[in-house]
């Protein structure tokens, strides 16, 4: 049951991101959440806590006039580890160039109804490998 509940936590968080509802997102993130971006993605590095999440998000969104995440699937690896496969679309700020990235993966560790870890990767394989290394 915990895995199913955590799938819903991840879905609600990604939906809140698309709405721009930062309060709803923060309510689903542990106060000490670790946010990680794989070296192949933007905003590479590790960010900590709600402030870190906000900084990470702002750095990413500053590059885009429009940006949206479409969730294809949220997969429970076990009771607390999940991977969301998404398609991302956006239009660059200034350039106006439209970009579409398919199959972008987010990894999550969710405990007590809140994400304690969130990672961004270009592939499911990279997300899964990182989750396994963090266990």
Language model features with spans:
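A beta-strand edge to alpha-helix "cap/lid" segment located at domain peripheries
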Residues: 1-5, 58-135
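A solvent-exposed, acidic/Ser-Thr-rich amphipathic alpha-helical stretch
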Residues: 24-80
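Generic anion/oxyanion-binding catalytic loop in active/binding sites
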Residues: 14, 42, 116
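Residue-level detector of alpha-helix boundaries and kinks
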Residues: 10, 38-42, 93
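A general boundary/transition motif marking the beginning of the first structured unit of a protein
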Residues: 1-2, 13, 44-48
């Amino acid at each position: 049951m915990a895995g199913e509940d955590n799938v819903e936590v991840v879905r609600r968080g990604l939906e809140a991101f698309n709405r721009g509802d930062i309060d709803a997102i923060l309510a689903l993130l542990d106060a000490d959440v670790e946010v990680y971006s794989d070296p192949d993605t933007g905003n590479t590095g590790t960010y900590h806590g709600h402030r870190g999440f906000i900084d990470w998000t702002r750095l990413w969104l500053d590059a885009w006039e429009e940006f949206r995440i479409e969730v294809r699937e949220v997969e429970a690896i076990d009771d607390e580890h999940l991977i969301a496969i998404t398609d991302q679309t956006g239009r660059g700020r200034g350039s106006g160039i439209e970009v579409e990235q398919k199959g972008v993966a987010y990894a999550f560790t969710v405990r007590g109804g809140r994400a304690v870890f969130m990672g961004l990767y270009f592939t499911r394989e990279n997300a899964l490998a990182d989750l396994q290394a963090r266990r």
